[in-house]
């Protein structure tokens, strides 16, 4: 049975289509690539499109680091209307006139820069007793949610129309930022209300939109020649390329595999490091350096 699966290691940046959940998108890609072990990093709502990094094979060991990267979004908000779901799928529950000036808009957006507090929407994918909150919301059940921290690094106006009542924003934020909640909070501060009508994730960490591939294109390419994956897949260690490198000699690898510490002179005290081996600098995993310059393994792929 398992002979049907391919052994593929690496990271692929999928352009998630509108209407599919992140899990549904993952299953489609797994079916196309015939990969048994695969996972996505960073959930996108069905209404959202854009970058959904997926880790294949041994790259799944490092997916947590992808989740920690900054995210970039382009969002279009409808002004003057608040909905039950904070997006265009919900019912309009409040309508107010738009009275703010451009100066007031800039002042409000500036107030969201830096660390902010958010209460996630009931229509989010946060799990409660094993089920997503939005499943409770659809049954009319309201669950108490804890306030969460987020960081907004940039919040820029790309377009604004008083006549058509829309606001387009470019947002760079930390992991765990709820864009629908952010837009709703901005709308409240503008005293008019707002909800999301379009949301696209353009960037995760240093991965840009130019590196994405959509499902249809991926399917065509793989059917034509499976070897094209070599040009699409990013290397296993790409997710942690920002970490400093510690190169070790081959004869101490067994020590790391057995949970032993290896003396180094790296100076990267209490930091994650990429461990490479030998003169070819073969990537073998992630480690940490303790306060007496000893390297110990965190995740190995050998």
Curated annotation (Swiss-Prot):
The keyword Acyltransferase does not apply. It catalyses: uridine(55) in tRNA = pseudouridine(55) in tRNA. The active site is at residue 45. InterPro entries: PsdUridine_synth_cat_dom_sf, PsdUridine_synth_N, PUA-like_sf, PUA_sf, tRNA_psdUridine_synth_TruB, tRNA_sdUridine_synth_fam1_C, TruB_C. The keyword Isomerase applies. Gene3D superfamilies: Pseudouridine synthase (3.30.2350.10), PUA domain (2.30.130.10). Substrate binds at residues 40, 73, 178, 199. It comes from the Bacteria. Keywords: Isomerase, tRNA processing. GO terms for biological process: mRNA pseudouridine synthesis; tRNA pseudouridine synthesis. It is an enzyme of class 5 (isomerase). GO terms for molecular function: RNA binding; tRNA pseudouridine(55) synthase activity. Its EC number is 5.4.99.25. Responsible for synthesis of pseudouridine from uracil-55 in the psi GC loop of transfer RNAs. Belongs to the pseudouridine synthase TruB family. Type 1 subfamily. HAMAP family: TruB_bact. This is tRNA pseudouridine synthase B. The lineage of its organism: Bacteria, Pseudomonadati, Pseudomonadota, Gammaproteobacteria, Enterobacterales.
């Amino acid at each position: 049975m398992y002979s049907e699966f391919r052994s593929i290691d690496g990271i692929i940046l999928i352009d998630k289509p509108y209407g599919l959940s992140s899990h549904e998108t993952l299953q489609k890609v797994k079916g196309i690539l015939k990969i048994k072990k695969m996972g996505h990093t960073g959930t996108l709502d069905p209404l959202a499109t854009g970058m959904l990094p997926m880790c294949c094979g041994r790259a799944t060991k490092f997916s947590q680091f992808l989740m920690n990267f900054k995210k970039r979004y382009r969002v279009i908000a409808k002004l003057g209307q608040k909905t039950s779901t904070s997006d265009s799928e919900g019912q309009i529950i409040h309508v107010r006139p738009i009275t703010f000036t451009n100066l007031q808009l800039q002042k409000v957006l500036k107030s969201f820069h830096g660390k902010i507090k958010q209460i996630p929407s009931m229509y989010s994918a946060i799990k409660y007793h094993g089920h997503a909150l939005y499943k409770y919301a659809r049954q009319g059940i309201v669950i108490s949610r804890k306030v969460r921290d987020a960081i907004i690094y940039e919040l820029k106006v790309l377009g604004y129309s008083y006549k058509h009542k829309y606001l387009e924003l470019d947002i760079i934020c930390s992991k765990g930022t709820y864009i629908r909640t952010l837009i709703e909070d901005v709308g409240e501060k503008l005293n008019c209300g707002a909800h999301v009508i379009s949301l696209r994730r353009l960037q995760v960490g240093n991965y840009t939109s130019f590196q994405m591939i959509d499902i249809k294109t991926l399917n065509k390419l793989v059917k034509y020649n499976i070897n094209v994956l070599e040009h699409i897949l990013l290397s296993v260690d790409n997710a942690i390329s920002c970490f400093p490198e510690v190169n070790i000699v081959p004869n101490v690898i067994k020590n790391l595999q057995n949970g032993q510490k290896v003396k180094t002179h790296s100076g990267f005290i209490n930091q994650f490091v990429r461990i490479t081996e030998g003169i070819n600098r073969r990537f073998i995993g992630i480690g940490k350096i303790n306060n007496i310059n000893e390297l110990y393994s965190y995740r190995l792929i050998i």
